[in-house]
Amino acid sequence: MRKADIVGTIAEKTGIPKVDILVALETFFKEVKTSLIEGEPVYVRGFGSFILKKRAAKIGRNIKKNVAVEIPEHFIPAFKPAKEFVQAVKESKHELVEHKEVDIAEN
């Protein structure tokens, strides 16, 4: 499901114009990004948390030059689903949908 699909579904269920839903959704995404950039996690009760995960410093490798590269400690954004969200997914009877990659050159 893509963002456009979500907007369409919400519009159908609520009667709110798609444009208004898109603005609200984009504003939500922007606020989540801003909060994480400022180091503040976002908690949505019953859904999950948008958090920062710390990645330790490590030595990587530039394979083109065959040189060791130091990767400093850093944070990455992550999503931690709420317990009830995880439980609902576990109990669902849906089969795992495999996404097939399409080669654009073939079409």
Task: Show where each model-derived region lies.
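Strongly charged
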Residues: 1-107
